[in-house]
Amino acid sequence: MSLTNTKTGFSVKDILDLPDTNDEDGSVAEGPEEESEGPEPAKRAGPLGQGALDAVQSLPLKSPFYDSSDNPYTRWLASTEGLQYSLHGLAASAPPQDSSSKSPEPSADESPDNDKETQGGGGDAGKKRKRRVLFSKAQTYELERRFRQQRYLSAPEREHLASLIRLTPTQVKIWFQNHRYKMKRARAEKGMEVTPLPSPRRVAVPVLVRDGKPCHALKAQDLAAATFQAGIPFSAYSAQSLQHMQYNAQYSSASTPQYPTAHPLVQAQQWTW
């Protein structure tokens, strides 16, 4: 014990010339540990235990805080100021979070703008609908009546009709265009676009032979009535030619004997013109 007591006069703190950090760092960082370890030095006897304890307490406080070569993460634990700096950094980063949290606000502002745009578009559509002219019954009747008479109007006629029914020439023009299109579409749906074939032409043929006997009592008036019904013009020249045909038929029938024929038109070969 005597040897150890003589050696304890030279403590590790005196040899290394280390400053006493119990008041500076130990009070801040190792305060609870000193309170918990405070009763232990009282149990130990002699200055050796006290000096060794001081040396052990002083060494761990310096090595992890300032020796950054072994552990690069110790720079964050260098001092309480660093921790405060990190906290300040977090506090400084808080406003951007607030700004990011406030970032959806423009979207909320944009939605009313979009609504306004949609409302504006709806307003335009409403204006376009309002621009549509509703014709009265009198105006429609007059337009349809004029359309049946004349499907295309010139500029003066259009202006005159517009002044009569209290419309603008442009409105009259558009109405005529739309009505022509409607009529054309209606005809196309009903199949009226196909032009009908012309009716066959009817030709009036005088009856010269009836029941195997020539008809001598055929008069010009009967022929005129027949041709009038058929739509063929009748003239005096055609009546004279008919009389000439009757005369030739009588002469030929008197000169030649009557033979029974299979068809009454065979006698037409004996006629002379």
UniProtKB/Swiss-Prot annotation:
The keyword DNA-binding applies. Residues 128-187 bind DNA. Gene3D superfamilies: Homeodomain-like (1.10.10.60). Its main location: nucleus. Disruption phenotype: Mutant embryos do not form any insulin-expressing cells in the pancreas throughout development, and instead accumulate incompletely differentiated beta cells. Simultaneous knockout of NKX6-1 and NKX2-2 is not distinguable from the single NKX2-2 knockout. Expressed in restricted areas of the developing CNS: the hindbrain and forebrain, and pancreas. Residues 20-38 have a biased composition (Acidic residues). GO terms for molecular function: cis-regulatory region sequence-specific DNA binding; DNA-binding transcription activator activity, RNA polymerase II-specific; DNA-binding transcription factor activity; sequence-specific DNA binding. Residues 1-56, 91-131 are annotated as: Disordered. CDD domains: homeodomain. Keywords: Activator, Developmental protein, DNA-binding, Homeobox, Nucleus, Transcription, Transcription regulation. Changing K184I: Inhibits DNA-binding activity and transcriptional activation of NEUROD1 expression. GO terms for cellular component: nucleus. InterPro entries: HD, HD_metazoa, Homeobox_CS, Homeobox_NK-like, Homeodomain-like_sf. One of its GO terms (biological process) is optic nerve development. It is found in: Nucleus. Belongs to the NK-2 homeobox family. Interacts with OLIG2. The homeodomain is essential for interaction with OLIG2. Transcriptional activator involved in the development of insulin-producting beta cells in the endocrine pancreas. May also be involved in specifying diencephalic neuromeric boundaries, and in controlling the expression of genes that play a role in axonal guidance. Binds to elements within the NEUROD1 promoter. This is Homeobox protein Nkx-2.2. It comes from Mus musculus (Mouse).
